[in-house]
Curated annotation (Swiss-Prot):
Belongs to the terpene synthase family. Tpsd subfamily. The gene is ag10. The lineage of its organism: Eukaryota, Viridiplantae, Streptophyta, Embryophyta, Tracheophyta. One of its GO terms (cellular component) is chloroplast. Its cofactor is Mg(2+); Mn(2+); K(+). A motif (DDXXD motif) lies at residues 388-392. Induction: By wounding. It comes from Abies grandis (Grand fir). The Asp-Asp-Xaa-Xaa-Asp/Glu (DDXXD/E) motif is important for the catalytic activity, presumably through binding to Mg(2+). One of its GO terms (molecular function) is magnesium ion binding. This is Limonene synthase, chloroplastic. Pathway: Terpene metabolism; oleoresin biosynthesis. It catalyses: (2E)-geranyl diphosphate = (4S)-limonene + diphosphate.
Length: 637
C-alpha cells in the first residue's frame, strides 16, 4: 500500500479538493453526536467471570470476646505465584546487549544529524515532515530517552516554520500547507510544550465545512493524514470545537477504512490508535505493538520515509525492550518477595494484584533509573487496595475507628490496641512510608514525612466516611459523594508517593500544580473515580456498597435510569480529560511538562485498566495479556 510520500503534494484550497466525507455522513458524524462512539476493533477473549457477592464468615474476637461476623468479597486469588516469578530469567541483562544498543544509538543519532546535513535527500520540500516522522517514530518505539537533544533541535526547527492559520507543509519551501504534516506537528509540538493553536485545522475544510484533502492524494496518503488528524484531536483543550469535530470525523472515517484495506502496518496502526487513543495508551504497550506491526508487514512496505533506516530504529527498539525486560524480571522478583515476606499473602480477604500493579508502573516509566518509582508505586497501590478492602468489607466499625486513630497518632505503640490482622498492615504501611521518605529526601532534598502523613490522613478520613455510609445504608447526594470519592479513590496517594522518589525536582510551587488541592489533582482523581464507578458499580452494589456515582446521580434525579447516569458521567469524564490535557500542556505553566508527566501517566494507567471493565479488581484477559506482552514475554531478536 502506498503511504505518504515525502514529496509535497499540496494544492490550493480553491483547486482540486475532495471532501473526505459525504454531506449526509457529515451530518451524522458532526451534528447528531458530540461523543466519539465506543471503538472496539479487536475481538477479545471471553472475560474472566468472578462472583462478586459477599460471603459472611465468623471470626473469634482477638480479645477473647464473642464471635464477629465479617463480610468478605469473593475476590479471585493471586494469579502469579511467587515460585513462578522467582523461576523467571532473561539473558538480556548481559553487557553484550547493552554494548550493541549503545552502538545502534550512535548510528541512529547519525541518522538524525543527516537530516539537516544531507540537502540532496532531505531538501526544502520534505525537511519538516522528515523531522516530525523521526521524532514520532522514536517516541512510539520507546527509545526517545537517548535522543532528547536531537528531538528538541528538530522540533525547534519545525516550530520556526509554523504558521498560526495554516500550519506547515511537508517542507520549509512547500507552496501550500499539508494536512498530514500539520496534524502531526500540532500533536507533537503541543505534547512538547510549544504554543500551537488547533485553529490551523480550519484551513483544511472545504466550503461546506467538511474536512478535505487535495484530489491528487492517493487513498493511502489520505488515510495517513486522517490517522494523524485523529491522533492530534486526542490532545484537545477545553472549548476547541474543531478538535471535537476532527475526533468524531476521523474516528468514523478510520473505522470504515479498516473494513476495506488489507492487513498492513497502516491497518495495524489504525487498530491500535482507535483501541487505546491517548488517555488509555501505555508507552510500553505502544512500543511493543509498533514494533510487531511494522515487522509483520515486512520491511519493504513499512517505510514512509524511504531515505530513513526504519530497520535500524526497530533494531534499537527491540534491544531496548529486552534489556528493560531483564530489569523488569529482577524488580518483579523483588516485589514478589516483599509481598510474600511481609505477610500480605496471608490476607485472604483482600485482592492481591502486585504483579498487575508492577506492570502498570513499568508501562508508565521505562527508564532504568526509575526503579524506586516503580517499586513505590506497587507497594502503595497494594496497601491502598488492602486498606480499601478492610474499610469496605472486612473491618468492623470499632476496628476501623481504632485503626484510623492509630494512623493519625503515627505511633507504633498504638498497634497494641489493634486486632492481629491490622497490626501487620499498619507495620507494612509504616515501613513503606518511612522508606519513601528516606528515598524522597535524597531526590527532593527535604523531609517529606509530614506532607505524606497529611495525604494519608485525608485518605483514611474518606475511607472512614464511606464505611459509615455502608454501615448506616446511607446514600449521599452526587455532590457529597464525589467530594469524598475523589480522595478515597487513592489517586492522590498512588501518585504523590511514587513521584517524590523520581530524580525530577518537585519544589513547592510545582507540587501546588500537581498535588491536592490543585485542579490537576482534582481532575485526575475525578477521572479515576468516575471511570471506576462506571465499570464496577454493579459488583460494588453486590458487596453492599450502594454509594456510587451512578446511584447517587439517580437519587438526585428521580425517574432517571442507569443509562442516564452513565451518559452524564461519561460526558463529565470527556470534559475532565480535555481539561487535564490543558493542565498538563498549558503553555503558561511555570512547571515543565516533565515534572507533571509521570502524574499524568499514572492517570492514564488507571484509565487503561478500567477501559472495558474493572481490571483493577479482576485480572481479566486484557489485564493478563498486558502483563504477558509488557513484562513477561521478550521480543525475538
Amino acid at each position: 500500500m502506498a503511504l505518504l510520500s515525502i514529496v509535497s503534494l499540496q494544492v490550493p484550497k480553491s483547486c482540486g479538493l475532495k471532501s473526505l466525507i459525504s454531506s449526509s455522513n457529515v451530518q451524522k458524524a458532526l451534528c447528531i453526536s458530540t461523543a466519539v462512539p465506543t471503538l472496539r476493533m479487536r475481538r477479545r477473549q471471553k472475560a474472566l467471570v468472578i462472583n462478586m457477592k459477599l460471603t459472611t464468615v465468623s471470626h473469634r474476637d482477638d480479645n477473647g470476646g464473642g464471635v464477629l461476623q465479617r463480610r468478605i468479597a469473593d475476590h479471585h486469588p493471586n494469579l502469579w505465584e511467587d515460585d513462578f516469578i522467582q523461576s523467571l530469567s532473561s539473558p538480556y541483562g548481559g553487557s553484550s546487549y547493552s554494548e550493541r544498543a549503545e552502538t545502534v544509538v550512535e548510528e541512529v543519532k547519525e541518522m538524525f544529524n543527516s537530516i539537516p546535513n544531507n540537502r540532496e535527500l532531505f531538501g526544502s520540500q520534505n525537511d519538516l515532515l522528515t523531522r516530525l516522522w523521526m521524532v514520532d517514530s522514536i517516541e512510539r518505539l520507546g527509545i526517545d530517552r537517548h535522543f532528547q537533544n536531537e528531538i528538541r533541535v528538530a522540533l525547534d526547527y519545525v516550530y520556526s516554520y509554523w504558521k498560526e492559520k495554516e500550519g506547515i507543509g511537508c517542507g520549509r519551501d512547500s507552496t501550500f500547507p499539508d494536512l498530514n504534516s500539520t496534524a502531526l506537528a500540532l500533536r507533537t509540538l503541543r505534547l512538547h510544550g510549544y504554543n500551537v493553536s488547533s485553529d490551523v485545522l480550519e484551513y483544511f475544510k472545504d466550503e461546506k465545512g467538511h474536512f478535505a484533502c487535495p484530489a491528487i492524494l492517493t487513498e493511502g496518503q489520505i488515510t495517513r493524514s486522517v490517522l494523524n488528524l485523529y491522533r492530534a484531536s486526542l490532545v484537545a483543550f477545553p472549548g476547541e470545537k474543531v478538535m471535537e469535530e476532527a475526533e468524531i470525523f476521523s474516528a468514523s472515517y478510520l473505522k470504515k477504512v479498516l473494513q476495506k484495506i488489507p492487513v498492513s502496518n497502516l491497518s495495524g496502526e489504525i487498530e491500535y490508535v482507535l483501541e487505546y487513543g491517548w488517555h488509555t495508551n501505555l508507552p510500553r504497550l505502544e512500543a511493543r505493538n509498533y514494533i510487531e506491526v511494522y515487522e509483520q508487514s515486512g520491511y519493504e512496505s513499512l517505510n514512509e520515509m524511504p531515505y530513513m533506516n526504519m530497520k535500524k530504529l526497530l533494531q534499537l527498539a527491540k534491544l531496548e525492550f529486552n534489556i528493560f525486560h531483564s530489569l523488569q524480571l529482577r524488580e518483579l522478583q523483588s516485589i514478589s518477595r516483599w509481598w510474600k515476606e511481609s505477610g500480605s499473602s496471608q490476607l485472604t480477604f483482600t485482592r492481591h494484584r502486585h504483579v498487575e500493579y508492577y506492570t502498570m508502573a513499568s508501562c508508565i516509566s521505562m527508564l532504568p533509573k526509575h526503579s524506586a518509582f516503580r517499586m513505590e508505586f506497587v507497594k502503595v497501590c497494594h496497601l491502598v487496595t488492602v486498606l480499601d478492602d478492610i474499610y469496605d468489607t472486612f473491618g468492623t466499625m470499632n476496628e476501623l475507628q481504632l485503626f484510623t486513630d492509630a494512623i493519625k497518632r503515627w505511633d507504633l505503640s498504638t498497634t497494641r490496641w489493634l486486632p492481629e490482622y491490622m497490626k501487620g498492615v499498619y507495620m507494612d504501611l509504616y515501613q513503606c512510608i518511612n522508606e519513601m521518605v528516606e528515598e524522597a529526601e535524597k531526590t527532593q532534598g527535604r523531609d517529606m514525612l509530614n506532607y505524606i502523613q497529611n495525604a494519608w490522613e485525608a485518605l483514611f478520613d474518606t475511607f472512614m466516611q464511606e464505611a459509615k455510609w455502608i454501615s448506616s445504608s446511607y446514600l449521599p447526594t452526587f455532590e457529597e459523594y464525589l467530594k469524598n470519592a475523589k480522595v478515597s479513590s487513592g489517586s492522590r496517594i498512588a501518585t504523590l508517593q511514587p513521584i517524590l522518589t523520581l530524580d525530577v525536582p518537585l519544589p513547592d510551587y510545582i507540587l501546588q500544580e500537581i498535588d491536592y488541592p490543585s485542579r490537576f489533582n482534582e481532575l485526575a482523581s475525578s477521572i479515576l473515580r468516575l471511570r471506576g464507578d462506571t465499570r464496577c458499580y454493579k459488583a460494588d452494589r453486590a458487596r453492599g456498597e450502594e454509594a456510587s456515582a451512578i446511584s447517587c446521580y439517580m437519587k438526585d434525579h428521580p425517574g432517571s435510569i442507569e443509562e442516564d447516569a452513565l451518559n452524564h458521567i461519561n460526558a463529565m469524564i470527556s470534559d475532565a480529560i480535555r481539561e487535564l490535557n490543558w493542565e498538563l500542556l498549558r503553555p503558561d505553566s511555570k512547571s515543565p511538562i516533565s515534572s507533571k508527566k509521570h502524574a499524568f501517566d499514572i492517570t492514564r494507567a488507571f484509565h487503561h485498566v478500567y477501559k472495558y471493565r474493572d481490571g483493577y479488581t479482576v485480572s481479566n484477559n486484557e489485564t493478563k495479556n498486558l502483563v504477558m506482552k509488557t513484562v513477561l514475554e521478550p521480543l525475538a531478536l
